[in-house]
C-alpha cells in the first residue's frame, strides 16, 4: 500500500509524491 514517506505512484492518491 502507498504510505506517506514512500515513493509511490500518485495514481493511488497516497504517498508524498515525490
Swiss-Prot record:
The light-harvesting complex (LHC) functions as a light receptor, it captures and delivers excitation energy to photosystems with which it is closely associated. GO terms for cellular component: chloroplast thylakoid membrane; photosystem I; photosystem II. Disulfide bonds: none annotated. This is Chlorophyll a-b binding protein 22, chloroplastic. It is a multi-pass membrane protein. It is found in: Plastid, Chloroplast thylakoid membrane. It comes from Pisum sativum. The lineage of its organism: Eukaryota, Viridiplantae, Streptophyta, Embryophyta, Tracheophyta. Photoregulated by reversible phosphorylation of its threonine residues. It comes from the Eukaryota.
Amino acid at each position: 500500500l502507498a504510505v506517506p514517506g514512500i515513493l509511490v505512484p500518485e495514481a493511488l492518491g497516497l504517498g508524498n509524491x515525490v
